[in-house]
């Protein structure tokens, strides 16, 4: 029940590029982002940090590090331009920071797609209690 409440809060507070990210994940993996990756492993989801449990979890750790490099925009609030072409994501934002945010989201969606074979349903709703300290970016 608590998990459903958390997911509901996340859905209500969505704006900017988060919607773009969710759409990228859906197109690239065929999986609904919040349900399948919103609390996955030790690094997917808000305020989660820890040693990645598998390749899918590593995708989230890399995405967090990518976002940390952005200094002139807030990728969770500001939207950017992109399109899908021949199964690939093409970022087309003129603002350099937002274009980099798009590239970060493209990278994680592509990483999820490339690691579908390592996706572990047992990690889908990981609370982070058993996550060890992560290395810095």
UniProtKB/Swiss-Prot annotation:
UniProt-listed GO biological process terms: arachidonate secretion; lipid catabolic process; negative regulation of T cell proliferation; phospholipid metabolic process
SUPFAM superfamilies xrefs: Phospholipase A2, PLA2
Tissue specificity comment: Expressed by the venom gland.
Entry-linked CDD domains: PLA2c
Cellular component GO terms, alphabetical: extracellular region
Cellular localization per UniProt: Secreted
S-S pairs: 42-131, 44-60, 59-111, 65-137, 66-104, 73-97, 91-102
Function in brief: Snake venom phospholipase A2 homolog that lacks enzymatic activity. Shows myotoxin activities and displays edema-inducing activities. A model of myotoxic mechanism has been proposed: an apo Lys49-PLA2 is activated by the entrance of a hydrophobic molecule (e.g. fatty acid) at the hydrophobic channel of the protein leading to a reorientation of a monomer.
Protein name (database record): Basic phospholipase A2 homolog W6D49
Chain residue ranges for the region called Important for membrane-damaging activities in eukaryotes and bacteria: 121-133
Keywords in alphabetical order: Disulfide bond, Heparin-binding, Lipid degradation, Lipid metabolism, Myotoxin, Secreted, Signal, Toxin
Important residue of the cationic membrane-docking site (MDoS), annotated site positions: 121
Quaternary organization: Monomer.
Site entry: Hydrophobic membrane-disruption site (MDiS): 130
Domain of life: Eukaryota
Activation/inhibition comment: Heparin reduces its edema-inducing activity.
């Amino acid at each position: 029940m608590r998990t459903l409440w958390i997911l509901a809060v996340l859905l209500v507070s969505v704006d900017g590029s988060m919607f773009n990210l969710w759409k990228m994940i859906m197109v690239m993996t065929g999986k609904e982002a919040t349900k399948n990756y919103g609390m996955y492993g030790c690094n997917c989801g808000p305020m989660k940090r820890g040693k990645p449990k598998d390749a899918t979890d590593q995708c989230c750790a890399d995405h967090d590090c990518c976002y940390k490099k952005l200094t002139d925009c807030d990728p969770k609030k500001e939207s950017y331009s992109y399109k899908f072409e021949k199964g690939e994501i093409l970022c087309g934002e003129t603002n350099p920071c937002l274009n980099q945010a798009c590239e970060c989201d493209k990278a994680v969606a592509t990483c999820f797609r490339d690691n579908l074979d390592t996706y572990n349903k047992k990690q889908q709703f990981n609370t982070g209690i058993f996550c060890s300290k992560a290395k810095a970016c």
